[in-house]
Amino acid sequence: MCYLSRMSSQQMQLTISGFENRIKILEDLMNEFDSNLYIRLKRECDFKLPKEYDVSIHALTILMKRHLSNMEPIDCYQDLDTGTLQTMLIFCCTLRMIEHYEKSLSNINFFSLSNDLKRLEEYNTSCSVLLSLYQRQLKKISTTIESYYLADTLRHNQNILNLCERIYNIQKLLNKREKASVLRH
C-alpha cells in the first residue's frame, strides 16, 4: 500500500471512488441476504468470545466469498488485499446486523417472555462485538495506509458514530425495560 504516497491527487480521488463503489456493492450484496443472516452468521462464528475474533473475520470472509462466487464479475475484488476486504465485510455485517436487530425491536414486547429479552441482549452483544471487530481491523491496517486516505475511504467516522449511537439507543431501551420491570415488582 506504500504506492499510495506516490499518487497524484487525481489518482487518489479515483482510488477513493473505487473503494467507495466496492463498499456500496458489498453493502448491497449484504442487503440481499435472507432474513436468517443472523442465524447463519451465528452458526459460522461465535461473536461472543474474544479469542474467536480472527476466526469470526475468517468466517465472514468465507461467507461473502461464497455469495460472490455465484455472481459475475468477481474480478474487481481480486486486487483488494485481505485486510481491506475483511474490514469492508465487517462494516457491512455490522450494518446488516444492527438493521436486523432494530427491526426485531418493533415486534417484541419488553415485558414478555424472558427468552425474548435474552434474544435482545444477544443481538446487542453481537452488534457491539462486530463494531469493535471493525474498529480493531481498522487499527491493524492503519499502519499500512496513509492516514488521510484511511480517513476518506475506510474509517467512515460518521458511520461509526452512527453505529455507536444506535447501539447506545438500544442499550437505553434495554435499561428502561429493566427499570420498569423492577418498579412493577
From Swiss-Prot:
GO biological-process terms attached to the record: chromosome segregation; dynein-driven meiotic oscillatory nuclear movement
Disulfide cross-links: none
UniProt keyword terms in alphabetical order: Chromosome partition, Cytoplasm, Meiosis
GO terms for cellular component: cytoplasm; cytosol; dynactin complex
UniProt superkingdom: Eukaryota
Chief localization: cytoplasm
Role of this protein: Required for correct meiotic chromosome segregation.
Protein name per the record: Meiotically up-regulated gene 5 protein
Species in which this protein is naturally found: Schizosaccharomyces pombe (strain 972 / ATCC 24843) (Fission yeast)
Name of the gene encoding the protein in the UniProt record: mug5
